[in-house]
Amino acid sequence: MKRTVGLLGILLIVCAGFAFAAGGSHSGGSQTGDVVFWTSHGPPANGTLEKIVNNYNATNPAVKVKFVQVPGSETDNTALMTAVRGGTGPDVYMLDRFIVAQRAADGILEDLTAVINKVDPNFKDKVLPFAWNEAQFRGKTYAFPFDTDTRGIFYNIDMLRAAGIDPAVMDRSKGPITIDQLREICRKIDTKDAQGNYTKVGFIPQYGQGWHYTWGFDFGGSFADLKAGKVTPTNPGVVAGFQFLYDWNKEMGVQQVQNFISSYAPPNNPPQNEPFITGNMAMMINGDWMVNTFERYAPDMHWGVTYIPVPKAGDKPTTWAGGWSMVVPTGSKRIDGAVRFMTYICGEAGQRLYFVENGNAPTLLALLNEKGLFPANKQYFQETLGFTQSRPALPVGALYWDALSTAQDMVVQNVQTPQQALQQVINQVQPQLDKFLPLQ
């Protein structure tokens, strides 16, 4: 608590002299009017974000923050890029942290290095190392880390019991189960109707947070060699993870899996209709935010969470962490006010409320180490931060993600082999990465 309060206190002291932070081109910019804050987050996260804004405005009446929800996603920042290039961008934008490097390379983010060094030269030591690293590009800082998250396999206890499976098999004190064990469990749960369509499934590996990074890391893969300046989607571990996706979908039936997802998890599916909640899916890979979803929409559901299944017995568990950040888009005329708000929302007050209401873990070490902050049903996620991996911070991070996602679609549909699909990722991404070499 004291460390972040100190950070805010220092900011307030030096705020009057913050013209240095923006550079000469902004030194004469207007510091009047609202600070405009954009996010692409929808419910329930946007409600919590708006509450943080309201709390800030209540104690900072001189320059208020205007909360605006805009279209977008993790890698689709079209609205932001169009607005910045048209001179109508926001003052603060909530950006998926792993693509900070790419947006900095695109020239649409302000360099915040001087700001952070002036406010607190030791700020980097007060947040999770991987979160800080994701906020960097070529030795400069372009973002304030906000939240983080890790992943595990959730299991519906009642569905397991109904299939004659003792839920104790999932007890994480025993370590992760193997993928072969997972498949045997699922065969006892998978149920089809007279037309051959699934009405209940044990597990669909690409569902939820079953991304390329999830399974690539799980099979020991590496996605980039930063020293060599190479993306490495054909790394044997990544290929093995994609092969697992190919084989699982082939066994279940590619079309039957697609039919199930279309029926029980269509786009914009309300949270209360999540197939894990409705009793149509027994297990899924997902993140810590789901705990709050369960509490809100299925408080009586019996569930557990444990390590992502591993290829073979004795393998160490894996997970990966994501998370978001706050950035100042290029051209902001209210950088002083923007940074003041960013220090609040990314400080203890903002991160604490976001964790309590939305479930995403904080990046501030002071909060992560606070005794009693993590309730029992979230302690798994606190534990996994000790061994989590993170996506490589690349100036083509969004492009790489999208290319991997396309490859994953081709593989789960059994249209291409993993090697074919992942070679296309190299062909698409590496020439773009070459433009930014050397990376280190």
Which sequence ranges carry the predicted segments?
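Short, low-complexity disordered leader/linker segments with a strong preference
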Residues: 1-36, 58, 420, 427-440
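Short, well-ordered beta-strand elements
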Residues: 31-42, 63-68, 92, 142, ...
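Short, polar/charged alpha-helical segment
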Residues: 42-64, 158, 404, 422
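Extracytoplasmic "Venus flytrap"/periplasmic binding protein-like
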Residues: 55-127, 140-143, 161-169, 274-275, ...
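Extracytoplasmic/periplasmic substrate-recognition and gating elements
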Residues: 58-66, 250-255, 295-361, 406, ...
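Hinge/lid segment of periplasmic solute-binding proteins
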Residues: 97-152, 157, 161, 180-181, ...
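Long, aromatic- and glycine/proline-rich binding clefts that accommodate carbohydrate-like moieties
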Residues: 126, 130, 299, 306, ...
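Glycine-centered hinge/linker elements that transmit conformational signals in sensory
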Residues: 183-190, 227-266, 308
